[in-house]
């Protein structure tokens, strides 16, 4: 399933009266584990990244990892920049 937007995910959650888990991931292994757990629970999931993770790699690399894993997922997955450190980084994430 392709990535969904956080807006879509949160609107569905509001309509369905449920919460969505949001988890920080720093590498491919963490992304895979988070999605696997979400699939076991049959729950949508928000994967978050931080400025320090983006600094270590790149936003494009992290987006590629999450996109590839979301495409194989059986539950909705979205990507969120947690605590963006600058306007420029926030705009890049959009």
Each language-model region and where it sits:
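N-terminal active-site wall of soluble small-molecule enzyme domains
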Residues: 8, 30, 53-94
């Amino acid at each position: 399933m392709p990535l969904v937007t956080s807006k879509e995910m949160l609107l569905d959650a509001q309509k369905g009266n449920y919460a969505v888990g949001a988890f920080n991931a720093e590498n491919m292994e963490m992304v895979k584990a988070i999605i696997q757990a979400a699939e076991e629970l049959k729950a949508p999931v928000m994967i978050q990244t931080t400025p320090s993770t983006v600094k270590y790699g790149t936003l494009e690399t992290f987006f590629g990892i999450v996109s590839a894993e979301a495409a194989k997922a059986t539950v909705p997955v979205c990507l969120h920049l947690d605590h963006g450190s600058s306007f420029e980084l926030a705009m890049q994430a959009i």
